[in-house]
Amino acid sequence: MNQAPVRVTVTGAAGRVAYALLFRIASGDMLGADQPVQLVLFDLPHAMKAMQGVVMELEDCAFPLLTEIIATDDPVLAFSDTQIALLVSARPRAVGAERLEVLADNAKIFAAQGAVIGRHANPDCKVLVVGNPCNTNACVAMKAAQKFSRIPARNFAALLRLDHNRALAQLALKTGRPVGGVKRLAVWGNHSPTVYADDRFTTIDGDSVPAIIDNIAWHHDTLVRTVDKRGEAILAARGLYAEASAASAAIDQMRDWWLGTRGEWTTMGVVSDGAYGVPAGLVFGFPVITDCRDYRIVPGLAVDAFARGMIDVNVRELTAELEIVKPLLPELFG
């Protein structure tokens, strides 16, 4: 274990999702069993006492890969020279609040964090936005960072892996086969109830999923609706939002981004280059293949009428979200 430690910053570090995330990062689940890490925990001043408790627990685990823990409420210290930033914290949705209200509340938070990242982070920093609404939050952070012309737009991503994992699980449950055999799944769009789980190209143990599940209504209705509504179902069942599964998905997405997928498909929310008719500049869920800490959108997939409609619904929703945000941040979108 002679590698230099990777500096990883986690925001909202005193929160519940971060609590499910930090110990797995420190144990090597995200970057590998031979990669040391330096953890930087960032949260607001009122959370510092709770964050110190998290620090003590991390220390008490005696993780061999964890070389240093820094806990701070100073964003410049938190993001200086960081190589990976996991933006977990976001202003939660109040009871009865609409999604668009949450957008407005979070726009300035992610603009501020993006600006600090753009000025102070490692130029090769990979930024994964976990806090919802993550697509538009990622777009805002990306635009703020671009003002400093140091970190490429493609280094910002939104957490679409949770939707991907949910769809993988449903396909495994439906077919009675191990989830590890599910390949070539595509998930498109926004991390919201419009997200589109697309199994037209998917295989399980090499067998075509559309051939195994010969029921178009299941693909177009049951699978899509189950993935779309999964967060609501978890909230109704446990009285809390999905936390452990969100943290696990963040681990999965960053691990694949950092270490590569060896030719396999996964899903990331990335800035569109115009592929599949998605307007350039939107942060949108696409099927991707990752390698060498970079990604490419899977090219040349057929888009039938149903898929076109589902992709377009997501384009409209994300465009509408940005229209809410733009007047609040004219310095970024003017």
Curated annotation (Swiss-Prot):
Residues at which substrate binds: 93, 99, 132, 166
Lineage: superkingdom: Bacteria
Catalytic activity, EC: 1.1.1.37
Classification via SUPFAM superfamilies: LDH C-terminal domain-like, NAD(P)-binding Rossmann-fold domains
InterPro entries (alphabetical): L-lactate/malate_DH, Lactate/malate_DH_C, Lactate/malate_DH_N, Lactate_DH/Glyco_Ohase_4_C, Malate_DH_type2, NAD(P)-bd_dom_sf
GO BP annotation list: malate metabolic process; tricarboxylic acid cycle
GO molecular function, one term: L-malate dehydrogenase (NAD+) activity
Positions with a binding annotation for NAD(+): 12-18, 106, 113, 130-132
HAMAP family: Malate_dehydrog_2
PANTHER family for the chain: MALATE DEHYDROGENASE
Family: Belongs to the LDH/MDH superfamily. MDH type 2 family.
Protein name: Malate dehydrogenase 2
Taxonomic source organism: Albidiferax ferrireducens (strain ATCC BAA-621 / DSM 15236 / T118)
